[in-house]
Amino acid sequence: NKIFLVNWLEAISKFKMYLKIERGLSENSIESYSSDLKSFYGYIKKNKFSENPKKCNSEIIKKYIYDQSKINSPKTQARRISGIRSFFDYLTFESFIKTNPTDLIETPKIGKKLPDSLSLNEIIKFINNIDLSHPQGIRNRAIIETLYGSGLRVSELISLKLSNLFFKENLIKVFGKGNKERLVPMGKLSKKYIKIYLKNERLKSKIIKKYSDTIFLNRNGSQISRVMIFKIIK
């Protein structure tokens, strides 16, 4: 009963259906993925590479990324790489391909400053000074890595839900101003410390039912506040 993919457009169409049915993403988010994948497909056609996604390898993707780096910001590059990675994760999951050609490709650093305009050196110094043996240390490290690595606003971070995390695709679903939805890359360190936090400190917390899906909690088991985030940063 195995289905074989014939071309890129068919594969993108199946992926969009997966995002809608399995991931429950909004039409806007799905179209954002589709747009980025069609940009990559345009590059495939322009350079006369194979119409079969199974023939795509890491070298082709690296050349595309290099091409994109000349015209797009690191943030746009990161989003497009995440989209391509998620697409190939899906193809791997469905056994259309054996290995993901993006596995060894790094996502560009977004390099966005924290909300209170700390410099990169200040952020690194602060991260190194976090006491990971302290009960809230892992949570605070996860918060800083997510704020910096994914370029989130404090208001976006405190409202993040467990259901917003897609570890396999290295993506976070964020709801910004006006409840506008977008997908942002999840950095390796952010992913690492969120997972440690969820398996340890958060798991031991007495969580208020209302906040059972909220990621970052205070000692009382409710959503961490903006004020607390700024105290952590400072």
Where do the language-model regions lie?
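Conserved catalytic core of the tyrosine transesterase superfamily
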Residues: 1-234
